[in-house]
From Swiss-Prot:
Protein name: Cytolethal distending toxin subunit A
Lineage of the species this protein comes from: Bacteria, Pseudomonadati, Campylobacterota, Epsilonproteobacteria, Campylobacterales
Region (Disordered): 20-51
Binding partners and assembly: Heterotrimer of 3 subunits, CdtA, CdtB and CdtC.
Topology of this chain in the membrane: Lipid-anchor
Cellular component aspect of the GO annotation: cell outer membrane
Species this chain originates from: Helicobacter hepaticus (strain ATCC 51449 / 3B1)
CDD domains: beta-trefoil_Ricin_CdtA (cd23414)
Function, in words: CDTs are cytotoxins which induce cell distension, growth arrest in G2/M phase, nucleus swelling, and chromatin fragmentation in HeLa cells.
Residue intervals of the Ricin B-type lectin domain: 130-217
GO terms assigned for molecular function: carbohydrate binding; toxin activity
Amino acid sequence: MRLLFFLLITLLFAACSSTPKVHQPKHSSKTEKDLGIGLSPTPPPNERIPGEKSRAMLMEMEGREIPVRIPDANASKIDKNVSNPISIMSSSGGLLTLWALKPRNWVWGYTPIDSFEFGRAKFWRIISFSNGQVIIKNMQEGTCLQAYGNGVIHDICDSKNQAQLWNLNFFDNQAIQIQSVSAKTCLQTPTVRTTTYYSIYLTKCATSSNLDQQWYITPVALEPEPIFFIK
């Protein structure tokens, strides 16, 4: 937990003065189906707000030795254009996470300590295409990040759906700005939260120094694999 705290502090200081190299689109499409969930992120009415359970689970693990998992040589191969499992973390430490697991629900941000009970719902894979665009696929549900209204939802993956395609614009410090191909806007989350969760919005892409559109691709939070093995 101490290492995680120092990592977040390091990311925050590194983020302060970076400027993104924004992809400049030629045109945009504004048509999208009304899903009946409103246009801005709204907490799911029938879902408990996580946090306390996650913290209790972590307290129980305090002092335990976590076993190292050796990769299975017989495991199915991953396509070259598909990343290893990752976490996507904001500059303020919020991980992109599925709260309500049913497709076509909003995607949220939770800190590692508050999202432990979500399991693999906070882990993703990035699928890259030859034109530089990507799809961001959730590890637990197999659904994909999709631009919708003023925020982002997760839905059944469809590589032909422009709302599920993203450009990753790099800041000088190698953080990324996540830009929707269809909406031409970028993922943003407040740097200060007043609730357990962070709301994730789509807003005009910043072209100058900022914090709230900076995201970091990291090893899966709290369950990292070793970088290499020594026999």
